[in-house]
Amino acid sequence: AICVSQAITYTDCTESGQNLCLCEGSNVCGKGNKCILGSNGKGNQCVTGEGTPNPESHNNGDFEEIPEEYLQ
């Protein structure tokens, strides 16, 4: 899965994978974690491993949405 837009900063999903994290969607994993895509785009997990870049975090949320213009 290709995670999108390095121009946007993201915070990290939890290492335990209890939070959803969409690659090729509205959210991406941070902190060098990678997404494991679930069925039907649901139940995605963020786990430790190479995959997404290490973007800077600027708040305490688990992830940030990509602005709609990136999703068209």
From Swiss-Prot:
Native source species: Hirudo medicinalis (Medicinal leech)
Name the UniProt record assigns to this protein: Hirudin variant-2
Annotated glycan sites: T52
Positions of post-translational Sulfotyrosine modification: Y70
Interaction with fibrinogen-binding exosite of thrombin: region residues: 62-72
Interaction with thrombin active site, as annotated region: 8-10
Residue ranges with Acidic residues bias: 62-72
Source taxon at top rank: Eukaryota
Subcellular location as annotated: Secreted
Keyword Signal: yes
Bridged cysteine pairs (disulfide): C13-C21, C23-C35, C29-C46
Principal location listed in the UniProt entry: secreted
Cited Gene3D superfamilies: Thrombin Inhibitor (Hirudin), subunit I
Residue segments, region Disordered: 47-72
GO molecular function, one term: serine-type endopeptidase inhibitor activity
Family: Belongs to the protease inhibitor I14 (hirudin) family.
Function: Hirudin is a potent thrombin-specific protease inhibitor. It forms a stable non-covalent complex with alpha-thrombin, thereby abolishing its ability to cleave fibrinogen.
InterPro entries: Hirudin (IPR024793), Hirudin/antistatin (IPR011061), Prot_inh_hirudin (IPR000429)
One Pfam assignment: Hirudin
Signal sequence annotation: 1-7
